[in-house]
Amino acid sequence: MALSELALLRRLQESRHSRKLILFIVFLALLLDNMLLTVVVPIIPSYLYSIEHEKDALEIQTAKPGLTASAPGSFQNIFSYYDNSTMVTGNSTDHLQGALVHEATTQHMATNSSSASSDCPSEDKDLLNENVQVGLLFASKATVQLLTNPFIGLLTNRIGYPIPMFTGFCIMFISTVMFAFSRTYAFLLIARSLQGIGSSCSSVAGMGMLASVYTDDEERGNAMGIALGGLAMGVLVGPPFGSVLYEFVGKTAPFLVLAALVLLDGAIQLFVLQPSRVQPESQKGTPLTTLLRDPYILIAAGSICFANMGIAMLEPALPIWMMETMCSHKWQLGVAFLPASVSYLIGTNVFGILAHKMGRWLCALLGMIIVGMSILCIPLAKNIYGLIAPNFGVGFAIGMVDSSMMPIMGYLVDLRHVSVYGSVYAIADVAFCMGYAIGPSAGGAIAKAIGFPWLMTIIGIIDILFAPLCFFLRSPPAKEEKMAILMDHNCPIKTKMYTQNSSQSHPIGEDEESESD
């Protein structure tokens, strides 16, 4: 008995060092983070609209005095404008009673027109104003994450990846519970902003951890494709999961289910990563400012930013546009994103492997062009079925870009800098967050000012124009001191070139400064 227990403990101890288990932890963290990111997409526009108009209807009802009839003997009829009902307490003529009931019914229709046609709102001005409000709420998470990322990158270099990873779980759990019980815009904004800090911890630490345990370029690309599949699954499940539970159970339900799943993730992290131990990197990483001056890293980061900015602009603006032009039901507001989510999942898994063979630069270039063209087609849709093809194209192409550029970030650090990954994946996450910070906030304002179709035209053209810059990532040159290290056969870090040795380098303003020790 003791021997079997000892063998089990030894097996569990060995599993803690398993690369596949670490990959699963990162996959699960990204899955839940992005479920929380997208579960609010169909809920918030409709929820804010409903609480705003409930408030307006209540103000109208409480401000209206009770009707008094001028004819004698009409005091036997009592009218309630709280629930718009008529109660007869005495004798009165049928004609007078019918007239007063008709008047009360007319008042009911006037004060509650929004509830009678909740799926097809007529208050165009209110919907336009909500573009800005919803856009700022969605952008707050990415903005906070954007500001937090550089600090998390430096922190992982000093104390390792497990503690920031577990901290991200704790913050995300608090944010999820806050979403469940928030009843005002202010508390929703705080919950969304708090999620940004947790996401920063999970994303930077998770990707850095994968890059450190998967040192081979091809294996790293495959692993990051799988991890991004978790992100894709979260984006896939979030909107329909949120919209269906919101319509048939209520606002609180999806967030409570999500909170339970987050607790499960925390338990696994606690067992495997042992976040109480500080595990600093064995060598000092390249300064963040040096990485930001590397033009190849900036091109890769720009691809991530502009590709994701397209879907980020869609998140607040598309549900409102659908409510305004298609009279869409609540559940349709989330299901509309389903094609993009499914295709993103397909794209990240297919091109996580294929991009290494065809060239990651080419994969990203084609992805940027497809993103732009698909976004340009979205305003042409007349109903929810017309959104299927362009949304599918958007998701698939963003999957191509993300699964190509994430491994390239680690590859560029191996090739041109010190192989410590916290800071470079902080830059990658900053790029991702810039797309999700600028996208909803600017997108909401642009949609209000010049309309949803012009918003899609602008971001579509930007993506297409940025695409040719990916050509410079075809064969980035190594720094001289790094080339000497990589040529050493005894070097413990293996990196496989993803282009042919005969391909020509394309230097673009390379920084000749040597790395600081």
Swiss-Prot record:
Gene3D superfamilies, alphabetized: MFS general substrate transporter like domains
Binding site for serotonin: 231, 235, 308, 311, 315, 337, 344, 402, 436
Membrane-traversing stretches: 21-41, 133-153, 163-183, 193-213, 223-245, 252-274, 295-314, 332-355, 361-381, 393-413, 418-438, 444-465
Topology, Cytoplasmic side: 1-20, 154-162, 214-222, 275-294, 356-360, 414-417, 466-517
Disulfide bonding pattern of the chain: 120-327
Any one GO molecular-function label of the UniProt entry: xenobiotic transmembrane transporter activity
UniProt organism field: Bos taurus
GO annotation terms (biological process): aminergic neurotransmitter loading into synaptic vesicle; dopamine uptake; response to potassium ion; serotonin uptake; somato-dendritic dopamine secretion
Regulation: Strongly inhibited by reserpine and tetrabenazine. Also inhibited to a lesser extent by ketanserin and fenfluramine. Reserpine and ketanserin inhibit by blocking the substrate-binding pocket. Tetrabenazine traps SLC18A2/VMAT2 in an occluded conformation and its inhibition is specific to SLC18A2/VMAT2 but not SLC18A1/VMAT1.
Main location: membrane
Superkingdom per UniProt: Eukaryota
Keyword Zinc carried by entry: no
UniProt keywords, alphabetically: Cell projection, Cytoplasmic vesicle, Disulfide bond, Glycoprotein, Membrane, Neurotransmitter transport, Phosphoprotein, Synapse, Transmembrane, Transmembrane helix, Transport
CC terms in the record's Gene Ontology section: axon; chromaffin granule; dendrite; secretory granule membrane; synaptic vesicle membrane; terminal bouton
Family: Belongs to the major facilitator superfamily. Vesicular transporter family.
Subcellular location: Cytoplasmic vesicle, Secretory vesicle, Synaptic vesicle membrane; Cytoplasmic vesicle, Secretory vesicle membrane; Cell projection, Axon; Cell projection, Dendrite
Record-listed Phosphoserine modification sites: 514, 516
Oligomer and partners: Interacts with SLC6A3.
Topological type in the membrane: Multi-pass membrane protein
Function: Electrogenic antiporter that exchanges one cationic monoamine with two intravesicular protons across the membrane of secretory and synaptic vesicles. Uses the electrochemical proton gradient established by the V-type proton-pump ATPase to accumulate high concentrations of monoamines inside the vesicles prior to their release via exocytosis. Transports a variety of catecholamines such as dopamine, adrenaline and noradrenaline, histamine, and indolamines such as serotonin. Regulates the transvesicular monoaminergic gradient that determines the quantal size.
Keyword Phosphoprotein listed: yes
Extracellular-side segments: 42-132, 184-192, 246-251, 315-331, 382-392, 439-443
Glycosylation sites: 84, 91, 112
SUPFAM superfamilies registered for this protein in UniProt: MFS general substrate transporter (SSF103473)
Catalytic activity: serotonin(in) + 2 H(+)(out) = serotonin(out) + 2 H(+)(in); dopamine(in) + 2 H(+)(out) = dopamine(out) + 2 H(+)(in); histamine(in) + 2 H(+)(out) = histamine(out) + 2 H(+)(in)
Signal peptide: none
The protein's name: Synaptic vesicular amine transporter
